[in-house]
């Protein structure tokens, strides 16, 4: 019983020369506040601008779809669903993640808000990823099956994809809360993160990323093959020049009639076909860039998210932040990519702003 008393009196009467040791012990028990260097302030400011730009751009796309009557049909309902998920990322996820970064990745806002933030994070990001997948599937079917993929079928299929997107995202995000599938908040260490339960890690990463990744890669491979096949079939629809004169005799009806063919070019391509091919090429390029940016943004995060709990690999905090915000940035790039390859949005933006003035 004397040992704690002596330690207490020693700690209270510690001379100033031993002050660094006492402060070191205090830091072990309770981490100090993060030092806001100029570089850190700059990074946090840029992240704040990213959140604001993501919200503004997606809200503009969503408002345009709601205001312009011609956009009240497919595939713009898929774009609206994607814009909603990305707006929610900017409103519900990014601000609290920015607070988390500002406090040195320590969560000081309580268990309830931590659970709500993680659920919104998984819900909105998963929905954004599956909305990209739905747009890629819609483009694939419209390019490769444009005869049977009618407007009525397209509308029904797109509505089903939107419903499945949000249903699957809800199940993945609420599974830890509803079924006690791991813990998201640790009060002693002030940690707030997605459940590290290995079974949930496999379930969530496969459902939120690896499955849609396989779908979009398969879709783009099929689009590439379809485009390559169309180029090949277009070449076979023409007759090349004949190097030498060829005599063709019709011996059955007119024995004395001779045709001389020196050059013949037959094409089956109309102006409508050319317009359709140009539209399909733009759509294929848009889907390719959309998929490429999606993979670049989310692949590092989900690789570490899967390997870290399964292999007990402690990823440095700085890399966790980089990979997480790189994934968030996909919500900023999505509307930029889609509207850049759709001329109707450019004219719709002009009409929208002209009416506001």
Swiss-Prot record:
Designated name of the protein: 5-hydroxytryptamine receptor 5A
GO MF annotation terms: G protein-coupled serotonin receptor activity; Gi/o-coupled serotonin receptor activity; serotonin receptor activity
Annotated Gene Ontology cellular component terms: dendrite; perikaryon; plasma membrane; postsynaptic specialization membrane
Main location per the UniProt record: membrane
Membrane topology per record: Multi-pass membrane protein
Homology family: Belongs to the G-protein coupled receptor 1 family.
InterPro entries referenced in this protein's UniProt entry, alphabetically: 5HT5A_rcpt, 5HT_rcpt, GPCR_Rhodpsn, GPCR_Rhodpsn_7TM
Ranges annotated as spanning the membrane: 37-63, 77-103, 115-137, 156-176, 199-220, 288-312, 315-339
Extracellular compartment residues: 1-36, 104-114, 177-198, 313-314
Cystine bridges: 114-192
């Amino acid at each position: 019983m004397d040992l704690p008393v002596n330690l207490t009196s020693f700690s209270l009467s510690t001379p100033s020369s031993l002050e660094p040791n006492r402060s070191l012990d205090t830091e072990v028990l309770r981490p100090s506040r993060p030092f806001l260097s100029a570089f850190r302030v700059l990074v946090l400011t840029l992240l704040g601008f990213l959140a604001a730009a993501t919200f503004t751009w997606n809200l503009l796309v969503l408002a345009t779809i709601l205001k312009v009557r011609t956009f009240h049909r497919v595939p713009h309902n898929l774009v609206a669903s994607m814009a909603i998920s990305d707006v929610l990322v900017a409103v519900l996820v990014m601000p609290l993640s920015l607070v988390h970064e500002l406090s040195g990745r320590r969560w000081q806002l309580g268990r309830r808000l931590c659970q709500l933030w993680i659920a919104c994070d998984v819900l909105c990001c998963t929905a954004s990823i599956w909305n990209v997948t739905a747009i890629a599937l819609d483009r694939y079917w419209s390019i490769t099956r444009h005869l049977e993929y009618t407007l009525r079928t397209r509308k029904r299929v797109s509505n089903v994809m939107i419903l499945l997107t949000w249903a699957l995202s809800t199940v993945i995000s609420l599974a830890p809360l509803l079924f006690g599938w791991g813990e998201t908040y640790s009060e002693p260490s002030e940690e707030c993160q997605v459940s590290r339960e290995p079974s949930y890690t496999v379930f969530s990463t496969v459902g939120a990323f690896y499955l849609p990744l396989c779908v979009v890669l398969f879709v783009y491979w099929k689009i590439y093959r379809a485009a390559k096949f169309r180029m090949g079939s277009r070449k076979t629809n023409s007759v090349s020049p004949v190097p030498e004169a060829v005599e063709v005799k019709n011996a059955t009806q007119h024995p004395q009639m001779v045709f001389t063919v020196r050059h013949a070019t037959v094409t089956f391509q109309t102006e409508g076909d050319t317009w359709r091919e140009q539209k399909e090429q733009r759509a294929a390029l848009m889907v390719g860039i959309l998929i490429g940016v999606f993979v670049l943004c989310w692949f590092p995060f989900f690789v570490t998210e899967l390997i870290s709990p399964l292999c007990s690999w402690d990823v440095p905090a700085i890399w966790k932040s980089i990979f997480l915000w790189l994934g968030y940035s996909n919500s900023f790039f999505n509307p930029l990519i889609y509207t850049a390859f759709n001329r109707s949005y450019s004219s719709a933006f002009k009409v929208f702003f002209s009416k506001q003035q």
